[in-house]
């Protein structure tokens, strides 16, 4: 009985001091293989966690570490024209193998940006939030960006430019669709300043 009592005391002490490595239980690893990849452009990211993304090996295999142990969705770019979204339940402190992921023809979104006078603003940035895709920064005088391939689904588009209000819009795309979205950025009535000083564009989220 004395040995058992000591054992339970040790377990309780470890639990109190983090001996169970709680961080590992909250995250895990997700791996799988994308079919028909073009490895030079293929990538996988966790939607809503854009910092969690990885490239893909020549055989289509990938591995993502530090994935939250919960239900989530993978955003997959398989090639220059194909993409997919894959639901997965990641397990804490384990490797979750999602198996093979087949892609479909992706949608392409063309975003045309102007100010209220119809002119092309400077410092235009276009982003599909929470997808892991890189934010596109347009060259001066360029008011159009093309995003894709995008798997079927809905996304939040964010557009910014110097000294204008930010605009956010929700949009949905279908398999293989070519969609054009015209965005007009309104004048920033605050004169380019923002409350916390952290946004060079001075726009307010949500436009």
Give the predicted meaning of each segment.
Residues 63-73, 79, 142-156, 161-162:
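Short Pro-Gly-centered beta-turn/loop motif in secreted/extracellular proteins
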Residues 1-16:
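Sec-dependent bacterial lipoprotein signal peptides
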Residues 17-29, 38, 94-107:
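Beta-strand-rich domain onsets/edges
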Residues 188-207:
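Ser/Thr/Gly/Pro-rich low-complexity, disordered linker/stalk segments of secreted
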Residues 28-50, 69, 115-134:
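Short, ordered, surface-exposed loop/turn motifs in non-cytosolic proteins
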Residues 78-98, 162-188:
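Structured interaction patches on ligand/partner-binding surfaces of diverse proteins
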Residues 48-63, 130-146:
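Short, acidic Ser/Thr/Gly-rich low-complexity loop/linker segments typical of extracellular
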Residues 37, 67, 101-103, 149-150:
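Hydrophobic loop/turn residues within beta-sheet-rich immunoglobulin-like superfamily modules
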